[in-house]
């Protein structure tokens, strides 16, 4: 069951980030304007698009656990800052995707050791056992 939870949450998180990166590339001017309204410089569009694509590639390929964990950390800070920026300019409804991303990120990170051969030292097995305890037996 934990394998499914991991892969579904990771796939949805990846889809969120890939969709966002494609939008940053295809609707560059609109995204620059939106970032400007949040108080960020326009040159971040290209950087964020590249980093989002790289983060997804690193997490899905998991060539190196430390890089994968670093990608999770980067996504965490990005999503927290995105939510905070939207709330800071009184556009809380626009922070909903960031909060959804945080939930998906948390589930993906906390269940990764159950689904991956090489374990992350930062996602303790106790968390995996907790997830196992609250999910129904062999569905």
Model-based region annotation:
Residues 1-139:
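Membrane-interface extramembranous regions
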